[in-house]
Regions:
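C-terminal coupling/interaction segments
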Residues: 271-318
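ABC transporter nucleotide-binding domain
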Residues: 175-269
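Solvent-exposed beta-strand sheet faces enriched in polar/charged residues
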Residues: 10, 233, 258, 293-295
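ABC-family P-loop ATPase nucleotide-binding domain
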Residues: 1-13, 309-318
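A generic structural signal for secondary-structure junctions
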Residues: 82, 99, 108, 145, ...
Length: 318
């Protein structure tokens, strides 16, 4: 492993009975970046996080995290990472301040009181710091849990769906914290259900499907693999079929109809499609137009196009 990568895995495999959760996971996360790990339910995202944080042992393959071998140097890996999972590790009988100070003592943090005060302020928890955590809302507990994972300033932070269930204000606060971490040199590996979250935070995305990394790249690079969403509205339902034929021929996509609006839409398989090209093609074919639009692809479109578990992805994206 070179100093370029904070996380590097090659051929990671994990089986649970007859289920192959990971089938050769190759992942490279550059230092000081946010890597978003996306994929449909059951793709292997959480299993990958559990392996890379030493909570599970791989059946095959190798990995290095923060410069240490995942298996041979598991204790050293644990000393360099922070983890926030889908379930919080907060003690409800302790106050928020006491929880963070406890984590500070467990990790032998110098000056835990000062670091605790800093994190309480950073996560907007100062006013509630001396209340029992059992009185906190779900969003406050999630923020406190994330603060606990940062108590020792980890080199690599693993966030497994950290904003699930948070209100928009709390989610934005967490996003600001994540951006600040990378500015300080921390590497973040993030799994999330929220495609907007990955789009806004991730420098690179690893799209996991059926236990493997199917595609990698920046959000912009992945979107470039998927064409834009084109829609045409015509004045008469009688020409919908003609409009659909033009879209089919031009884009290679499968047209869908909204007959109440006399509209036909398609996700283009051609990333070079432009609105002027679309309008000219319809005009050449003699198809009258009321309106035509071309929307840039989103990560939702990337999900639907680039993963094999299409039905699951549609359910997740809904």
């Amino acid at each position: 492993m070179t100093s370029t990568y904070a996380v590097l895995s090659e051929g990671l495999e994990k089986r649970f009975g007859e289920v192959r959760a990971l089938r050769g996971l190759d992942l490279a996360v550059a230092e000081g970046t946010v890597c978003g790990v996306l994929g449909p339910n059951g793709a292997g995202k959480t299993t990958a996080v559990r392996l890379l944080t030493t909570l599970l042992r791989p059946d095959a393959g190798s990995a290095r995290v923060a410069g240490h071998d995942l298996v041979r140097e598991a204790a050293a890996v644990r000393g360099r990472i922070g983890v926030t999972g889908q379930d919080t590790s907060i003690d409800g009988d302790l106050t928020g301040r006491q929880n963070l100070q406890l984590f500070g003592r467990l990790h032998r943090v110098r000056g835990p009181a000062g670091r605790t005060a800093e994190l309480l302020d950073r996560f907007g928890l100062t006013e509630a710091a001396d209340r029992p955590a059992s009185t906190y809302s779900g969003g406050m507990r999630r923020r406190l849990d994330l603060a606990a994972s940062l108590i020792r300033r980890p080199d690599v932070l693993f966030l497994d769906e950290p904003t699930t269930g948070l209100d928009p204000a709390s989610r934005n606060l967490v996003w600001d914290v994540v951006r600040g971490l990378t500015a300080e040199g921390t590497t973040v590996l993030l799994t999330t259900q929220y495609l907007e979250e990955a789009d806004r935070l991730a420098d690179d995305i690893a799209l996991v499907d059926r236990g493997r990394v199917a595609h990698t790249g920046s959000p912009a690079q992945l979107k470039a693999l998927v064409g834009a969403h084109a829609e045409v509205i015509v004045p008469d339902a009688d020409v919908l079929t003609e409009a659909a034929a033009v879209l089919d021929r031009l884009t290679g996509g499968q047209p869908s109809f909204d007959r109440e609006r006399n509209a036909v839409a398609v996700v283009s398989k051609d990333p070079t499609l432009t609105l002027p090209l679309l309008v000219r093609a319809l005009d050449t074919a003699g198809v009258p137009l009321l309106d035509a639009s071309l929307r840039p692809p989103t990560l939702d479109d990337v999900f639907l196009r680039l993963t094999e578990n299409t039905d699951t992805v549609k359910e997740r994206a809904a």
